[in-house]
Amino acid sequence: LINYDGRIFIGVHVSEDGEVSGETVFHYKQDGIILSGTYAGGGIISGVLVGTVKKDDTLHFRYHHVNAGGKLESGECVSSPQLGEDGRVRLHEEWQMMDGQKSKGSSVVEEIES
């Protein structure tokens, strides 16, 4: 099982409609099956997420952030992990915004050295 506690991720690929970029840094915490985290950078001023870690290590969470335009955004995401040969985790994410146009897309975030 993957323990996400203390891991740091950075955006490496995002759909057109996404606000995450290569400048967005995610800090994850895990306590049992509960996942929480903070993120910021690029077009995101401040964000938080909370969710659960499933038995297959996938993440199911909701997120809220304030973007560079000062708008509050929220959505939900399912992230599937891929473990690299170097032991770093890469998360393949499918997300959907819950506000406004309810845009959806995919992104990839990759673990960096903490």
Regions found by a protein language model. Give the residues of each.
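Edge beta-strand at a domain terminus
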Residues: 23-25, 53, 96-114
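Short hydrophobic/aromatic-rich beta-strand segments that constitute the beta-sheet cores
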Residues: 10-11, 35-38, 59-63, 89-94
